[in-house]
């Protein structure tokens, strides 16, 4: 076996955490031959529940699970980690304004960014799943000045996977036949899942679908509104699918994207495709050796331009809001 990889997960006793930890421990992220050390962060009142989760992890006897440590102190849990999955976030409660949500999460991700800056491994990679993910990632990144901005990413892989599922259903294809899906922008209702560069069994997806009305009025709203639809159906938010997407995103980031394909990741914009620099914006990317690169040179039609600009504008406003709160 290779040397153990130290992985931190925040919000580890939550619903997504519960789905995520057993996948990581079973080898879904790095394979069964790479041992993992789980470092699990929770708020103090949730530590008792987290102890129960650790009991279950012990009872699974996963060969790849080297050790588990839990705690409520970020500096202790993040010490020496090479991968930090920031899953825990303050959910929006009834009557809460968006500004209140940004402020509450700002305090969480400011503290975690500073702790990662102090104690994480030099080669750390940080993926943010907790919502609002793009802006939470921006806050953490802004509070970790010694960690390169390229080491931070927010999760839009769930939207990417949802888009693949919807396109596969529409075209009667297998999900494995679909490549080059793109989700632009924010993990929110303004996101833009784009099939104009996607392929279905090697053919252009938009040409296979040949239905602009479906793209505009069914596909995009279904993908963007999927989280709300799941809450309506099961009475709780997406957990297993969010955990699965978190695994997919981390695996591809660290181990590389398949040849001839790309994935969607929210990363710090360098101005590509006219997006303001510094926004945590979802792009099509290829990855290799733990590094990502934005896919450049894609043709953007007028419809796509409007959608891409609208989601950028929302992120710009979110950045301004957290700047006004003194969080970045």
UniProtKB/Swiss-Prot annotation:
Q: Which CDD domains match?
A: MDH_chloroplast-like
Residue pairs linked by disulfide bridges in the UniProt entry? none
- The answer on whether this UniProt entry bears the keyword NAD reads yes
Q: Which GO terms describe its molecular function?
A: L-malate dehydrogenase (NAD+) activity
Q: What is its EC number?
A: 1.1.1.37
User: Which residues participate directly in catalysis?
Assistant: 187
Q: Which UniProt keywords apply?
A: NAD, Oxidoreductase, Tricarboxylic acid cycle
The entry marks the following residues as binding substrate, namely 92, 98, 131, 162
Give an example GO biological process: tricarboxylic acid cycle
Cited SUPFAM superfamilies: LDH C-terminal domain-like, NAD(P)-binding Rossmann-fold domains
**What catalytic activity does the UniProt entry give for this protein?**
(S)-malate + NAD(+) = oxaloacetate + NADH + H(+)
Q: Which HAMAP family match?
A: Malate_dehydrog_2
Q: What does this protein do?
A: Catalyzes the reversible oxidation of malate to oxaloacetate.
Q: What is this protein called?
A: Malate dehydrogenase
Natural source organism: Paenarthrobacter aurescens (strain TC1)
* Lineage of the organism: Bacteria, Bacillati, Actinomycetota, Actinomycetes, Micrococcales
């Amino acid at each position: 076996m290779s040397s153990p990889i130290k992985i931190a997960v925040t919000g580890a006793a939550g619903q997504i955490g519960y789905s995520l930890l057993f996948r990581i421990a079973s080898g879904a992220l790095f394979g069964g031959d790479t041992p993992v050390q789980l470092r699990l962060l929770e708020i103090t009142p949730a530590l008792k529940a987290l102890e129960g989760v650790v009991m279950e992890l012990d009872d699974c006897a996963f060969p790849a699970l080297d050790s588990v440590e839990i705690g409520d102190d970020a500096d202790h849990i993040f010490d020496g980690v090479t991968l930090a999955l920031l899953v825990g976030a303050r959910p929006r409660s009834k009557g809460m304004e968006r500004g209140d949500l940004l402020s509450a999460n700002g305090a969480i991700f400011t503290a975690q960014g500073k702790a990662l800056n102090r104690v994480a491994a030099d080669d750390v990679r940080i993926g943010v799943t907790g919502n609002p993910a793009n802006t939470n990632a921006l806050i953490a990144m802004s509070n970790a000045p010694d960690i390169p901005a390229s080491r931070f990413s927010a999760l839009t892989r769930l939207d990417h996977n949802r888009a693949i599922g919807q396109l596969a259903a529409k075209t009667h294809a297998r999900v494995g036949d679909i490549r080059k899906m793109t989700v632009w922008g924010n993990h929110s209702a303004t996101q833009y899942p784009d099939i104009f560069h996607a392929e279905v069994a090697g053919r252009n997806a938009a040409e296979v679908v040949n239905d602009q009305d479906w793209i505009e009025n069914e596909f995009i709203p279904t993908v963007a509104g999927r989280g709300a639809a799941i809450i309506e159906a099961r009475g709780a938010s997406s957990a297993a699918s969010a955990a699965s997407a978190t695994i997919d995103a981390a695996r591809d980031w660290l181990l590389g994207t398949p040849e001839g394909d790309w994935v969607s990741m929210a990363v710090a914009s360098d101005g590509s495709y006219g997006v303001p620099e510094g926004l945590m914006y979802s792009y099509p990317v290829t990855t290799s050796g733990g590094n990502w690169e934005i896919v450049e040179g894609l043709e953007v039609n007028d419809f796509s331009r409007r959608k891409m600009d609208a989601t950028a504008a929302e992120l710009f406003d979110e950045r301004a809001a957290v700047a006004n709160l003194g969080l970045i």
